[in-house]
Amino acid sequence: MVYSRRGSLGSRLLLLWLLLAYWKAGSGQLHYSIPEEAKHGTFVGRIAQDLGLELAELVPRLFRVASKGRGDLLEVNLQNGILFVNSRIDREELCRRRAECSIHLEVIVDRPLQVFHVEVAVKDINDNPPRFSRQEQTLFILESRMPDSRFPLEGASDLDIGANAQLRYRLNPNEYFDLDVKTNEEETNFLELVLRKSLDREETQEHRLLVIATDGGKPELTGTVQLLINVLDANDNAPEFDKSIYNVRLLENAPSGTLVIKLNASDADEGINKEIVYFFSNLVLDDVKSKFIINSNTGEIKVNGELDYEDCNSYEINIDAVDKSTFPLSGHCKVVVKLLDVNDNTPEMAITTLFLPVKEDAPLSTVIALITVSDRDSGANGPVTCSLMPHVPFKLVSTFKNYYSLVLDSALDRESLSVYELVVTARDGGSPSLWATASVSVEVADVNDTLRAFAQPQYTVFVKENNPPGCHIFTVSARDADAQENALVSYSLVERRVGERPLSSYVSVHAESGKVYALQPLDHEEVELLQFQVSARDAGVPPLGSNVTLQVFVLDENDNAPALLAPRVGGTGGAVSELVPRSVGAGHVVAKVRAVDPDSGYNAWLSYELQPAPGSARIPFRVGLYTGEISTTRSLDETEAPRHRLLVLVKDHGEPPLTATATVLVSLVESGQAPKASSRASAGAVGPEAALVDVNVYLIIAICAVSSLLVLTLLLYTALRCSAQPTEAVCTRGKPTLVCSSAVGSWSYSQQRRQRVCSGEAPPKTDLMAFSPSLPQGPTSTDNPRQPNPDWRYSASLRAGMHSSVHLEEAGILRAGPGGPDQQWPTVSSATPEPEAGEVSPPVGAGVNSNSWTFKYGPGNPKQSGPGELPDKFIIPGSPAIISIRQEPANSQIDKSDFITFGKKEETKKKKKKKKGNKTQEKKEKGNSTTDNSDQ
């Protein structure tokens, strides 16, 4: 029997244990506790072991933890099954002031599905000291108050809970007051100042006390407040409220006038001392008074302004109930108003610009501005997202929560768009959601990245010569797409030398307007083409710019009248006398009028006309239209007048034409008298010239020696230059120029001509030019006529020495063309048959593309010298004389008058051959030879 009882008891105990185990496994509830502010990795518990799970089955069964709140506070290590702290846990932030604070977790495993509930209690630590709302409180106490009278004080608050929030108060030692702390049903401390000894206002009007609040944590934390007690004269029974603290809940969007609470206080006194009025206490802040209003008679508190949960989610209003006695007494209570949040705030954005204006060459990802977004609402109404308008070279980059950076996403070009107006939109997560926009003006700062450009790389300008000094000839303009200083352009000349003078002595350019001015009158005879560069530079750092080339063609004007070459021996009154035998036939050349014109083109194309004398009969003479040769038109007979006064008009083809006149006196003599007259004239000239013969001989020898040395130097220099590599802006050698002057007056020059062109480089030296008829002729050019070369021009001495009456050197007519103005040259072909000896045909017409001239005086062309022979004559630069170095035979005799005559030469030569032994005739030949040299 006893045995059976014992077995029955054991069975019952086993059954009870199984029931408890089954109940525990079915509930799946685990409890852990950790202190707040635990560090990351703090051990919480062996959750796998406590749940009866093996470590090897955690992963296969998909062990996972879910949280109802923040899921990142706790984490489970699947390797060892330990629950640990993953992030900082702040109990005050997590649970506010709730007595119990727990983190609820749900552990879920599959195969089979099981759910376990885990509760982790967060223990409070003493990390918040007590705090008073004010650093000083003021009380007014009547001196008639009896000992043990109590005066409410605003207590301190502690964010902690439990023992850490259990506050103890103490007062600095004094003989009048003490502290008393009461706790209501909500365990809220109600602090009162207790009067222990009667006050005497006449003895002490003011008392200063220090209240110290100490919490119950370890270690203890404290807070203090100053009490200023003013002693008043007043009353016996004070009004009293039903409660010392009233709690009210109110929506934050409650309109103005909404009733918050109606207070009721009572006073045991009678009469006027029983009548009570209600006021806000002196402890109430002005901000609270602006949002609430109290009816002093009824005690109703109403909303007076806009409430905002985000500004303040609770208000503590201290109310005084004061009787109307002469010495009023007051009662006190506190109304705590707690606000409930609604989604009534749009997101807020704060934009801080860091890099404005933005340079257009700023690198990508440059931070332009920082944008901070926030929403004063809480909960789901609080999260904010930010976005930027599309199709702009910027983007938003989220750096931290509620922080965005506005960065450069693609390259900028200020010349395309200088200002970007960006719109940033911020939107919260409420329902319905609220949004806000903000504008950001991004100005693009200019950098000097645009080269100054002219409309074209080269300009061609035509300017007439003899312009007034300082005249405006052209305006250059360059465009720059930059701004401000980078677009300020200044123009300047690229200074070079033009010949022996600087470019700035010819032209100048205005630095701001780009106007080009001629500083002096331009002379076509000096400069035909002025080529230079104008530079445009901006004011950027570093400055940018470019150059443009100006080709200024100086157009010729007919400003030079034909100039007659002075005769060797003049007649009376500036006229020239010529003796002509009566036996000459038609076409006999009597004399030649020589004239030159410094102009070019048609302005230098000379023609000759014979002006008839008034009242005179038809004379038997004529003048070549373009040669200036005076010849007979018919045979002379005995009936002709013995003397003729011929007036030759020399006229150019300019507009208007300019003229010069020459007078020739022609005397008709018998055939035997002409040589005698010539001999007498020559003999008369020997006397005054004899003194100069020796000097001229020495001078000729010296000049020939110097010229030979200089010719050798020039030949050596030319050979070196031709062997060297040609460079830019250096005059290269052209075809040889052939200018011949012989006894019969025939001369020519090659088709290749070098025109005067003044550029930025110095022209080649042409101080000495030797001309030899023995130079080989270059191959006939079949190319199109080239532009005139400005590097070479005839000197005044060469002009004076030419036998041609038509001086067409550089007589081109400027015509605009693709490559510049072309030169049209009046020409006479050397192959054209001559109608009469001593004349040349007039030019076929302007525009004939030929630069070759051959003038023929006398019955035939002169014979060209051989390669080894010396030239008949050469020209000394700076001297109007053409020196003859040809050796004449001893019996030769040449007679020349002031103007070159040809028919008389041939007749004289025949007579000289018949009289070789005559000594007097030899003297005449020597005199005539000297005269010829002077004339040339």
UniProtKB/Swiss-Prot annotation:
Biased composition (Polar residues): 774-786
Keywords, comma-separated and alphabetical: Calcium, Cell adhesion, Cell membrane, Glycoprotein, Membrane, Repeat, Signal, Transmembrane, Transmembrane helix
Principal cellular location given in the protein's record: membrane
MF annotations from Gene Ontology: calcium ion binding
Residues in the Extracellular compartment per record: 29-696
Keyword Signal: yes
Region span, Disordered: 759-793, 815-875, 887-936
Entry-listed glycosylation sites: N264, N448, N547
Membrane topology: Single-pass type I membrane protein
GO annotations of cellular component type: plasma membrane
Signal peptide extent: 1-28
Location of the protein in the cell: Cell membrane
Cytoplasmic side: 718-936
Domain Cadherin: start-end pairs: 33-132, 156-241, 242-349, 350-454, 455-564, 580-677
PROSITE patterns per record: CADHERIN_1, CADHERIN_2
Basic and acidic residues biased stretches: 895-909
Pfam family, one: Cadherin_2
Listed InterPro entries: Cadherin-like_dom, Cadherin-like_sf, Cadherin_CBD, Cadherin_CS, Cadherin_N, Protocadherin/Cadherin-CA
PXXP repeats: 773-776, 785-788, 818-821, 873-876, 877-890
GO process annotations (BP): cell adhesion; homophilic cell adhesion via plasma membrane adhesion molecules; nervous system development
Cytoplasm recorded as keyword: no
Function of the protein: Potential calcium-dependent cell-adhesion protein. May be involved in the establishment and maintenance of specific neuronal connections in the brain.
Protein name as annotated: Protocadherin alpha-5
